[in-house]
């Protein structure tokens, strides 16, 4: 599964 937007970015793990 590959989301269009970076989910790891939403978690704040950038």
UniProtKB/Swiss-Prot annotation:
One MF annotation (Gene Ontology) recorded for this entry: cysteine-type peptidase activity
Record family assignment: Belongs to the peptidase C1 family.
Superkingdom field: Eukaryota
Source species: Calotropis gigantea (Giant milkweed)
Any single GO BP term: proteolysis
Residues that bear Pyrrolidone carboxylic acid: 1
Official protein name in the record: Calotropin-DI
Entry EC number(s): 3.4.22.-
Keywords: Hydrolase, Protease, Pyrrolidone carboxylic acid, Thiol protease
